[in-house]
Amino acid sequence: MVQERLTSTVANAVGARIVGGEFRPGDSMRLDELEAEFGVSRSVSREAVKILESLGLVRSRRRVGVIVQPMGEWNVMAPQVIQWQLQGPN
């Protein structure tokens, strides 16, 4: 239960930053960076990335990290993506 909330918190924070333009297409981040920033375990950061991947916002690449995808790859009809767009500065 706690892990699910942590996963949601990380996914929501990173997703909002991607949709808000803080991360640009092609930008990369590593799991260890997410772990350090949010103070979470590797499994929590992996699950958060899986959520973002399922929405088309990022793609994981071995030895490269997590790459932000262009907006054309996003599932813009997903409720979470719509929510992040409405909350964002744009």
Model-derived segments and spans:
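Short linear motifs at protein or domain termini
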Residues: M1-N90
